[in-house]
């Protein structure tokens, strides 16, 4: 029998196989691929905060079972999620500004300065230059609280295998003007790192 030709069911005595039968997936499901930065919201990009929770509710109501995201690490030179600087660290762009405001780590005025442009587009260069200093302010304000926060201390202990190295790398990267590591001239992390 020609492999490209199927015999009619009447000739074989059995029903033809479904063209895409797959026994590895016992039930059908659907999902969506969308990076959280593409979610609509008040911030400069979508976050893993309220926008993400609303999105999950919407896709669940539509019958979707899966939300696949691109890598969520801190992006490097070009802001591609596929060129993340770490497989463990999170992308600071995905922090929920409203949550930082609710925790009194950023003021309403500081958050308003970071809002998305009126045309809905994101300028990642502007975002980097504005968000990074704002997050440093939030980190300074929250430092005392975090040093006494059991969940944070547990996280630090559990993630010690990569967290210290990431902090040193980040401090060196900043000290070297955010250039590529092969261009670095400073090889000692600043003391405040």
Give residue ranges: language-model regions.
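N-terminal carbohydrate-binding accessory modules
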Residues: 4-27
